[in-house]
């Protein structure tokens, strides 16, 4: 039994070694027992437990004596209760709540529940399902284990035979009896691990011997085994032509070899001069005389390699300092420089979410982590609740509070666990043996390991270190060999390059010689070929001439045939022409009839158009005539009022002047008229007497009557003259009022007036008739009377001349005034005519300009617009998105050599009309705005390229007219067609908000249509105007608050977005 006890003790210690952590591994440098023990003590003393830390399996880590354990404080003893099961037996006091299996204190009474087990008589079986502990060794069920003979294998296949565990029972089992022996082909044979078992394994028994062709023979690595291997046995001796002869490497064996006997001497131009290798011979060579100095930009400056010369170089002067962002700062590697770096200064602290917090690794940091601080408490649903692991939490869990009672069919019945219920169950009836013996041995050797185990561990570690050192030495040796081989290869390459260069030179010279020879041969061959070609050409020429003759004869025959064919063709052509003529005549008749019908239709259409045009022209002419008449009436009324005012002024002035002149003339004429009247009265009395005497009417009466008539005519003439004089005076007064006091009289008129004066003087002389005296007897009296009469006549003549001179002056004045008045009236009339003509011209030019504007705005070609319409229509209906490139390609049709129709309003009108007709009913606002955003680029492109002033007004007026023609339809119960189109025009940025407001305010010819549309646009118009008011109110509020809190306003202005107004519109739109 003693031997068995020792073996068990050894196995337990080995298991403790495997459970050891990496922190308490033994150092390889310390070999003695004292050093290991002291170090372990020092580690344990200095190690401080952190908060909520529980140390497990501590009794095999410590090497203290039992005396030292007893001297510790109460706190440490309480901690050790949890740590070691040995101390638990001594110091732990059982409480009433704790159930201990196998307890024999029957005197202590416990409060039993219904489900609790009565441990007073635990051995007796109470239920059928309970285990009968009285005889636990006996197997009760087929599935129970038979503990009476646990060592014996009960099942052939599944059970392990513990009676002889070391022996292998199955093919797959490990044979622990002699684990060193190899049982399978794939297993290693530990009995003699050096022996090779497989082809691929290394034979460690004699690793020096070569087993495969590819293996190195380490037994005599110097001997060459393959053709390609180096023979290290006598590496100095040259075996192949290509090998170096190391026996006397200094002696030159080949021409190409380096002569190492005097390697310092330079033999070739290209060779290095080793006599003074430090001196630089070529530009490309390194100058070894001062290799530390930097000679090129790309070279390293070895004089001070620590200093950084380039941006990319490492600064060796202080390699610890960080030079780049990506470099580690070795000066203080513990400090974290980047976000992604670990902070080594305090690696225990958690820096990222994904990192472990080593400061308190027991605490749970993530949802998926276990909370080691209180591992007993349940953190997740799936975790076990260790705080009260005895209580059953789920249906599938074991109820440890009453673990003895079997709850399910598949559960073990611990109430009588000693009894074997099934064949597969263990028999615990004799399970208590071999427990005390092990515990005693463990108590004696708890604190310390045996010496041979420690030495074994040290020996193993030394072995490992030696093997590692050997491996490193081998690797270093191999590296040196590889470096030598690479150096040699480089030298061979350089030599090979030099040989190749020399060979190339020789080949070039040979090629030159060969070229010269080839040239001479080619020249001779060319001469021979030329002669041969000449002879062949002559023969071919002869043959060609003969062929030409034959061809000429054939051509003649062909010409004759062609003539015949031509005659036949002419006849056929005549027949065809006649047929064609008849067909053409019939077609012409049909075409004429069709043309006549078309012409009639066109004429009808033209007549209708002409009628419409005539009606339009008549209306325009009537309107113009009305306007002209109204203007003429206004002008006439103005002239009449002016004339009245002037007449009244002139009448007053003329009356006063005439009165004064008449007074003067009357006073002068009184004397003359009195003398004449006396003579006439005498004559009349005399005549009356004669008439009374004679009853018949004599010739004198007739003459008198004639004279009276003449007088009446003269009086009428005088009256006319007076009237004319008055008119002349009026004209003079008008001229004075107009500022024309000086009148211009032509010279011809003056001469004419002088001649008239002379004629009047002559007439006066002839008119003086001599009066005959009836009484011939009284001649003397008559002579005296004649003398008196002559004197009187002279005086009369003088008076008459004076009168006539006055009248002439008045006449001249009146004639001149008439001429001036006529010129003034003509000038006034001309001015008025010119003014009227100018006004008419202005109206006509205005109308022409309006017509030109209208034509420019609506200029179009029908075919081009049709093509444009056909291309756009399907895309707009399919809700196609127009890019900038699509707009350019589609609108390229509108540009022609004659005219650019993009400048007009027609293409825009076509697009918007198609869009209006393509809008479906009963859609949401978002869908309409998506459609508008698809067509937005095309509308903006057409508007930008148009050259129309106030284009926005034309767009709105035309959309309004189009909606009026459609009779203002509704797309849904809430929205109408006009509202959606106005929204699209505003949302797409084609028409600005201010232009909408101005359009509503303007009074145009479309005022009636606007008033109709306002029935549907009332709320839309309110929305526009209210926004402006809101903005103005906001601005006023800001102005008021600026005076109070300037800082608050500045913060608000920063936070307000640039497109604040547009965002507000957007919210109301959507």
Swiss-Prot record:
Q: Is Coiled coil given among the entry's keywords?
A: yes
Per UniProt, its applied use is: Possible candidate for an effective malaria vaccine as determined by epitope response in sera.
Q: Does the keyword Chaperone apply?
A: no
Coiled coil spans: 475-736
Q: What keywords sit in the KW lines?
A: Coiled coil, Merozoite
Q: Where is this region: Disordered?
A: 66-88, 355-388, 423-483, 667-692, 735-786
Q: Where is the composition biased (Low complexity)?
A: 73-83, 773-786
Q: Which GO terms describe its cellular component?
A: cytoplasm; membrane
Report biased composition (Basic and acidic residues) as residue ranges. Answer: 435-460, 474-483, 751-765
Check the record and name the SUPFAM superfamilies matching this protein.
Answer: Apolipoprotein A-I
Compositional bias (Polar residues): 735-745
Q: Domain of life of the organism in this record? A: Eukaryota
Q: Where is the signal peptide?
A: none
**PANTHER family named among the record's database cross-references:** DAUER UP-REGULATED-RELATED (PTHR47372), RE19971P (PTHR47372:SF11)
This chain belongs to the protein called Uncharacterized protein PF3D7_1120000
Organism encoding this protein: Plasmodium falciparum (isolate 3D7)
């Amino acid at each position: 039994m003693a031997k068995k006890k020792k073996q068990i003790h050894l196995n337990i210690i080995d298991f403790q070694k495997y459970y050891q952590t990496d922190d308490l591994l033994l150092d390889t440098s310390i070999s003695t027992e004292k050093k290991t023990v002291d170090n372990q003590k020092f580690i344990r003393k200095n190690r401080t437990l952190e908060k909520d830390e529980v140390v497990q399996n501590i009794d095999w880590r410590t090497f203290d004596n039992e005396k030292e354990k007893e001297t510790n404080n109460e706190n440490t003893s309480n901690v050790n209760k949890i740590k070691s099961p040995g101390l638990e037996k001594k110091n732990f006091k059982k409480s009433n709540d704790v159930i201990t299996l196998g307890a024999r204190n029957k005197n202590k009474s416990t409060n039993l529940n219904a489900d609790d087990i009565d441990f007073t008589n635990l051995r007796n079986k109470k239920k059928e399902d309970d285990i009968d502990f009285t005889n636990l060794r006996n197997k009760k069920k087929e599935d129970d284990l038979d503990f009476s003979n646990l060592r014996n294998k009960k099942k052939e296949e599944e059970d392990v035979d513990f009676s002889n565990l070391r022996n292998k029972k199955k093919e797959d089992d490990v044979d622990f009896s002699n684990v060193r022996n190899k049982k399978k082909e794939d297993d290693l044979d530990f009995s003699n691990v050096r022996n090779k078992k497989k082809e691929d394994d290394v034979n460690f028994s004699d690793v020096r011997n070569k087993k495969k062709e590819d293996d190195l023979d380490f037994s005599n690595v110097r001997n060459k085994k393959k053709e390609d291997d180096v023979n290290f046995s006598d590496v100095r001796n040259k075996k192949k032509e290509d090998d170096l002869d190391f026996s006397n490497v200094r002696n030159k064996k080949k021409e190409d070899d380096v002569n190492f006997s005097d390697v310092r001497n330079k033999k070739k131009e290209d060779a290095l001069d080793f006599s003074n290798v430090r001196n630089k011979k070529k530009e490309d060579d390194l100058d070894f005389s001062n290799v530390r100095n930097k000679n090129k930009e790309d070279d390293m400056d070895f004089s001070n390699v620590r200093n950084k010369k380039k941006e990319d170089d490492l600064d060796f002067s202080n390699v610890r300092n960080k030079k780049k962002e990506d470099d580690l700062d070795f000066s203080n590697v513990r400090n974290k420089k980047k976000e992604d770096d670990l902070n080594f200064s305090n690696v225990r602290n958690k820096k990222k979410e994904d990192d472990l917090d080593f400061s308190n690794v027991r605490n749970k940091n993530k949802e998926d982590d276990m909370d080691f601080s209180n591992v007993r408490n349940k953190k997740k649903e799936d975790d076990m609740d260790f705080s009260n692991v005895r209580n059953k939490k789920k249906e599938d869990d074991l109820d440890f509070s009453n673990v003895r009672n079997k709850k399910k069919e598949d559960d073990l019945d611990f109430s009588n666990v000693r009894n074997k219920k099934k064949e597969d169950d263990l028999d615990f009836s004799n399970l208590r043996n071999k427990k005390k013996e092990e515990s005693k041995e463990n108590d004696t050797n708890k604190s310390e390991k045996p010496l041979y185990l420690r030495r074994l561990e040290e020996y193993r570690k030394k072995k490992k270190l030696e093997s590692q050192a050997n491996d490193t030495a081998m690797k270093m040796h191999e590296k040196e060999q590889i470096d030598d081989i690479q150096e040699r290869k480089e030298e061979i390459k350089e030599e090979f390059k030099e040989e190749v260069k020399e060979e190339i030179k020789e080949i070039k010279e040979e090629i030159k010689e060969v070229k010269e020879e080839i040239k001479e041969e080619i020249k001779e061959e060319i001469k021979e070929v030329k002669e041969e070609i000449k002879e062949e050409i002559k023969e071919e020429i002869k043959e060609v001439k003969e062929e030409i003759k034959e061809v000429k004869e054939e051509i003649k025959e062909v010409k004759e045939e062609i003539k015949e064919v031509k005659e036949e063709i002419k006849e056929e052509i005549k027949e065809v022409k006649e047929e064609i003529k008849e067909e053409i005549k019939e077609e012409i008749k049909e075409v004429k009839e069709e043309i006549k019908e078309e012409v009639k239709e066109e004429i009808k259409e033209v007549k209708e158009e002409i009628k419409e045009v005539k009606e339009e022209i008549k209306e325009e002419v009537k309107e113009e005539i009305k306007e002209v008449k109204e203007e003429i009436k206004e002008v006439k009324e103005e002239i009449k009022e002016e004339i009245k005012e002037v007449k009244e002024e002139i009448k007053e002035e003329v009356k006063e002047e005439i009165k004064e002149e008449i007074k003067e003339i009357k006073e002068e004429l009184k004397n003359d008229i009195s003398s004449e009247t006396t003579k006439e009265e005498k004559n009349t009395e005399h005549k009356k007497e004669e008439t009374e005497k004679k009853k018949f009417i004599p010739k004198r009466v007739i003459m008198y009557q004639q004279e009276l008539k003449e007088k009446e005519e003269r009086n009428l003439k005088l009256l006319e003259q007076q009237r004319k004089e008055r008119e002349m005076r009026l004209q003079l007064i008008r001229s004075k009022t107009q500022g024309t006091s000086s009148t211009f009289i032509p010279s011809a008129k003056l001469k004419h007036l002088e001649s008239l004066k002379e004629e009047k003087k002559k007439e006066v002389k002839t008119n003086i008739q001599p009066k005959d005296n009836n009484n011939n007897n009284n001649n003397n009296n008559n002579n005296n009377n004649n003398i008196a009469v002559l004197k009187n006549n002279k005086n009369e003549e003088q008076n008459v001349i004076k009168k006539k001179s006055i009248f002439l002056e008045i006449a001249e004045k009146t004639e001149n005034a008439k001429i001036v008045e006529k010129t003034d009236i003509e000038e006034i009339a001309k001015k008025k005519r010119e003014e009227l003509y100018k006004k008419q011209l202005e109206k006509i030019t205005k109308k022409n300009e309006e017509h030109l504007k209208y034509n420019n705005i609506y200029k179009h070609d029908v075919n081009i617009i049709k093509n444009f319409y056909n291309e756009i229509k399907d895309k707009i209906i399919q809700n196609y998105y127009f890019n900038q490139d699509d707009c350019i390609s589609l609108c390229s049709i509108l540009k022609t050599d004659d005219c650019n129709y993009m400048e007009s309003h027609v293409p825009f009108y076509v697009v918007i009309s198609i869009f209006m007709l393509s809008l479906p009913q009963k859609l949401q606002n978002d869908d309409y705005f998506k459609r508008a955003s698809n067509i937005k680029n095309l509308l903006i492109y057409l508007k930008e390229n148009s050259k129309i002033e106030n284009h926005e007004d034309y767009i709105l007026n035309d959309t309004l007219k189009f909606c009026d023609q459609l009779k203002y339809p509704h797309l849904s119960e809430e929205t109408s067609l006009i509202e959606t189109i106005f929204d699209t025009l505003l949302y797409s940025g084609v028409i600005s908000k201010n232009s909408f407001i101005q359009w509503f305010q303007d009074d145009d010819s479309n005022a009636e249509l606007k008033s109709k549309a306002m029935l549907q646009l009332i709320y839309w118009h309110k929305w526009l105007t209210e926004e402006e008011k809101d903005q103005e109110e906001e601005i006023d509020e800001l102005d008021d608050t600026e005076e109070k809190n300037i800082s608050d306003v500045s913060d608000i202005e920063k936070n307000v977005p640039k497109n604040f107004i547009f965002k507000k519109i957007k919210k109301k739109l959507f």
